[in-house]
Amino acid sequence: MGEKLDKDSILYKKRHSIAHVMAEAVLELFPNTKIAIGPPIKDGFYYDFDFEKHISEDDLLLIEHKMREILKTGSPFIREVITREQALVLFKDEPYKIDLIQNFDVTDEITIYKSHKFTDLCRGPHVDNMNKLDPKAFKLTSIAGAYWRGDERNKMLSRIYGTLWNNEKDLKAYLKLQEEIKKRDHRKLGRELNLFSVHDEIGPGLIFFHPHGARIRALIENFWREEHFKNGYDILFTPHIGKSWLWETSGHLDFYKESMFEKIEMDRSDYYVKPMNCPFHIAIYNTDKHSYRDLPFRWAELGTVYRYEKIGAIHGTMRVRGFTQDDAHIICTYEQVNFEVREVLRFAIDMWNKFGFTNLKAYLSTKPEKAVGDDDDWQMAVKVLEKALIDFNIDFDIDEGGGAFYGPKIDLKIIDSLGRAWQMSTIQFDFNLPVRFKMTYTAEDGKEKRPFMIHRALLGSIERFFGILVEHYGGAFPVWLAPLQVVIIPVNSIVEEYALEVLSRFQNEGIRIKFDNYCNMRMNAKIRQYQSKKVPYMFIIGEREVVEGKISIRTRTNEQINGLELKEALEFVKLKISNKEIL
């Protein structure tokens, strides 16, 4: 769920059209190449090719030059409807096109687009002619491998990515942003700041947190727990595996098996590592009988789950195979639904603000064609979700029919410092699992009723959120999240006794502080070193500071604060931490 590509937008049409121009250029330069597919995507386009010989990013400029030659012709993009038989003849030498055609439904209309010397199997839409494409407003950006149809059992193709904008100015702005994104790439900063690593020889998509990264993760998780206790939640811990009957009852084996790891056979039973926490929370609920007086239950867990992601989809900490889900389930009565949804939304907004995200975007997904549950419950749930968004003045789009088959939901996106939207929090009604697991409570009239169940995530997964935080702050975390908050840098060995006194005082107050008494490096070099490691504060201690009992502070942003009393310096740092200030 999220922003959809607008097929009627001029940029969509331009990007689709330039993908065809790129394909023609490639075929002219590399005649024996086979073509696959080439759609527009967010911010650009790509085309998949099966090259006879290996090409590299060094060839991109050559392809760009040929594309500009083709654009000069001003050729039109002409749409034609053809029969299945005509299509099979037309693309007889293109195996990937034949594969597509053979998998079309017999009722599908087959269309092609012709432009200059190129013809492609395509639904469109496109611009009228090549004069609408600014030759200075596009750039080919990279080459990557991509399996045909996204299936690892198929051949690996070469995917050429590009970007196109309405004009050169917009292109330059986009490319500048991409350079900043590269600098902030959490995989790059993860290595440079020694935060985490991945080891494919041990297992792809599995994250190893190093001491500094683990410190940040622990701070996030501790804060998460504290906030949940403050907001009336109880914390659960559940197992990592469960017998197959559990996943059969939940429906995971019917509808989600492709994303689950293979079964584990032991003790004459089949087990699966859990892809989700929900059935375990329900098992706890069903341990006892409940009255309406017991509800609501607000149960949260940082539960590690395992999902089989294809190798090509794995990406740093953002897309992994084992991750810790920030999960909660609210089990309540009909009368409590409105309050509980409002409270979840308030909690989500408050949580994001404290991590430095104040710009949110929401999507409300409503009932799809095929759905379970009572119509009245669906209507009520949608109204409750919509009212909560309106009451909190959150900008939202409605995705008609975009809900899960088991209930409507709100998806919340945060906007990071680079203007990118990240899907994070979800508030999801579930009209399915309470029925499958026969969840009940005794109502005020003594009758057994089905409770309402709301799935809720705030951070999504800890690993993914960690990666987003790294990129949002460029590794320069707020002081409260910085793995190392202060470094003491002595001017010489004479001041060591006072420096150790400062170290002890700050350590006793819980400040994460280090004393760097390594002598074989100049002080300015040390300052630069710790600034590059994104340490918030460097305490510079010389003989003057010793005599006056004071501290001079250099920040990672190169601000200088001189002559603070020891107590003042301590209060200064503690205030930055308690206020969760961004340096």
From Swiss-Prot:
Classification via PROSITE patterns: AA_TRNA_LIGASE_II
Region described as Catalytic: 185-478
Compartments reported by the entry: Cytoplasm
SMART domains named among the record's database cross-references: tRNA_SAD
Enzyme class: ligase
Swiss-Prot/TrEMBL GO biological process terms: threonyl-tRNA aminoacylation
Disulfide bond as UniProt keyword: no
Coiled-coil ranges per UniProt: none
Cofactor binding note: Binds 1 zinc ion per subunit.
GO MF, any single term: threonine-tRNA ligase activity
InterPro entries for the chain: aa-tRNA-synt_IIb (IPR002314), aa-tRNA-synth_II (IPR006195), aa-tRNA-synth_II/BPL/LPL (IPR045864), Anticodon-bd (IPR004154), Anticodon-bd_dom_sf (IPR036621), Thr-tRNA-ligase_IIa (IPR002320), Thr/Ala-tRNA-synth_IIc_edit (IPR018163), ThrRS_anticodon (IPR047246)
Broad class of the protein's primary localization: cytoplasm
Enzyme Commission number(s) of this protein: 6.1.1.3
Keywords, ordered alphabetically: Aminoacyl-tRNA synthetase, ATP-binding, Cytoplasm, Ligase, Metal-binding, Nucleotide-binding, Protein biosynthesis, RNA-binding, tRNA-binding, Zinc
Cofactor: Zn(2+)
Reaction catalysis annotation: tRNA(Thr) + L-threonine + ATP = L-threonyl-tRNA(Thr) + AMP + diphosphate + H(+)
Binding site for Zn(2+): C278, H329, H455
Family as reported in the entry's similarity comment: Belongs to the class-II aminoacyl-tRNA synthetase family.
HAMAP family found in the cross-reference section: Thr_tRNA_synth
Function: Catalyzes the attachment of threonine to tRNA(Thr) in a two-step reaction: L-threonine is first activated by ATP to form Thr-AMP and then transferred to the acceptor end of tRNA(Thr). Also edits incorrectly charged L-seryl-tRNA(Thr).
Subunit structure: Homodimer.
Name of the protein in its database record: Threonine--tRNA ligase
